[in-house]
């Protein structure tokens, strides 16, 4: 049972970790415009930037049509929360006002069983970002990724239909494809089984004497998939209402605000940076949600860009929106943020940021109990695409902030794992966004 502080002392992009490559011997594989790996030479190929297609600004679209195997499970889950995990969840009490509350115990960030419970109750429910519409804007394009223990595959078939599947061959469970590109079919690298981009089994090699082998029953296991503006979302949740509005289901009442900032056809993808971190995914999320409490101490250049007197944090359902005006005294005279920066953190692990001529997305990918990866994608207004110096400097400044946060978050993780720390306090009102996130976690995990 949780105690109050007065009575107790003190979780583009393809997210596949493998290189951008084909899983079959077909020669029709083409790279997508979003790279898999961090490119230290930001503008080594200017033409690739200029050829990046527009962001999709169409309304949300849910695709449920798929060729599925009735004998291949969509997801293995447990219906009940183990008592040991339940007790950990309830060590945090959301009913205690944040001014008097303790933060969740360190075991929320260090216990492997708790992380497994998070995957099941948070990441395997509702909508999760898988990638971006431009990755599969053409027929026969695909990309892959992972979400916890789930390997997924998103494809657009020859008829233009969008699909998502478990990226697992139904024969002997080999991972079917990796990376991203363009194919007419998927060939399993293990025994050569062939699947269409609609998930159907086209060929089971050498299965001439196998009895009652029905290809219709051995297609790839489907996932729900939706397009919402520039984002592709997937869901493993069988109970999800396919007729509900995607934006509202994913974000809540802030969906229109996020849409107004993210659905901009004038934006082009420019660059991806990745930051592996030796910390629990929530450590980074907590850091992001502290209303820049840490910024003056940890990010000197970034702090000089902000007018902290204008900082505003608003919590609405599954989203925390932070807005801040820019300083009149720009560091180096470089105007990166424009007049105001907009940061929308969408639970559990995704952020949309608009400032100046930029949009960035921040995706915190859980990769283990004490490991995650931050994927930062940069979009830029078309008018600035020819200004290499502006692009290089803007990306370098933001990347440096993430490098500084990486050091902080990994330090926090090490501290959480020591016997010296159990719970902390909220500094109010500046850490109200963190408290709101913890309350949502408590509600979702119990």
UniProtKB/Swiss-Prot annotation:
Cofactor stoichiometry and binding remark: Binds 1 [2Fe-2S] cluster.
State which Enzyme Commission number(s) the record gives. 1.14.15.7
Tell me which tissues or organs this protein is expressed in.
Answer: Expressed in roots and leaves.
Q: What pathway does the annotation place this protein in?
A: Amine and polyamine biosynthesis; betaine biosynthesis via choline pathway; betaine aldehyde from choline (monooxygenase route): step 1/1
Which prosthetic group or cofactor does it need?
[2Fe-2S] cluster; Fe cation; Mg(2+)
Q: Does the keyword Oxidoreductase apply?
A: yes
Main localization is: plastid
Give the matching CDD domains.
RHO_alpha_C_CMO-like, Rieske_RO_Alpha_CMO
Function of this protein? Catalyzes the first step of the osmoprotectant glycine betaine synthesis.
Q: What is this protein called?
A: Choline monooxygenase, chloroplastic
Q: Which organism is it from?
A: Beta vulgaris (Sugar beet)
């Amino acid at each position: 049972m949780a105690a109050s502080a007065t009575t107790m002392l003190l979780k583009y992009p393809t997210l596949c970790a493998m290189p951008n490559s084909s899983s079959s011997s077909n020669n029709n594989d083409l790279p997508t415009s979003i790279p898999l790996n961090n490119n230290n030479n930001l503008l080594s190929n200017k033409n690739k930037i200029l050829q990046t297609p527009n962001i999709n600004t169409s309304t949300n679209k849910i695709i449920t049509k798929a060729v599925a195997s009735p004998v291949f499970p969509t997801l293995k889950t447990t219906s009940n929360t183990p008592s040991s995990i339940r007790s950990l969840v309830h060590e945090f009490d959301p009913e205690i006002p944040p001014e008097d509350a303790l933060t969740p115990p360190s075991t929320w960030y260090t216990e492997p069983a708790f992380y497994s419970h998070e995957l099941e109750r948070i990441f395997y429910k509702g909508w999760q970002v898988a990638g971006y519409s431009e990755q599969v804007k053409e027929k026969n394009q695909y990309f892959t990724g992972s979400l916890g223990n789930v390997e997924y595959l998103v494809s657009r078939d020859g008829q233009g239909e969008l699909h998502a599947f478990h990226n697992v061959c139904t024969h002997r469970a080999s991972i079917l494809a990796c990376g991203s590109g363009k194919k007419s079919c998927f060939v399993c690298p293990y025994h050569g089984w062939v699947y269409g981009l609609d998930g159907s089994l086209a060929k089971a090699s050498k299965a001439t004497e196998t009895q009652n082998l029905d290809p219709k029953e051995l297609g790839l296991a489907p996932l729900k998939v939706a397009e919402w503006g520039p984002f592709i979302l997937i869901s493993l949740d069988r109970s999800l209402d396919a007729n509900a509005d995607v934006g509202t289901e994913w974000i809540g009442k802030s969906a229109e605000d996020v849409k107004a900032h993210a659905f901009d056809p004038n934006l082009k993808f420019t660059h991806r940076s990745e930051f592996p971190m030796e910390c629990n995914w929530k450590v980074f999320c907590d850091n992001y949600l502290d209303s820049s409490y840490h910024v003056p101490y940890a990010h000197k250049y970034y702090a000089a860009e902000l007018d902290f007197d204008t900082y505003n944090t608003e919590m609405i359902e599954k989203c925390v929106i932070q807005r801040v005006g820019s300083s009149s005294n720009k560091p180096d005279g470089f105007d990166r943020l424009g007049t105001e920066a907009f940061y929308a953190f969408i639970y559990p692990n995704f952020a949309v940021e608009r400032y100046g001529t930029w949009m960035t997305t921040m995706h915190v990918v859980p990769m283990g109990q004490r490991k995650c990866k931050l994927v930062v994608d940069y979009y830029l207004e078309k008018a600035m695409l020819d200004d290499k110096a502006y692009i290089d400097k803007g990306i370098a400044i933001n990347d440096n902030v993430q490098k500084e946060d990486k050091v902080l978050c990994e330090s926090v993780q090490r501290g959480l794992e020591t016997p010296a720390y159990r719970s902390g306090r909220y500094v109010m009102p500046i850490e109200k966004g963190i408290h709101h996130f913890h309350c949502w976690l408590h509600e979702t995990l119990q």
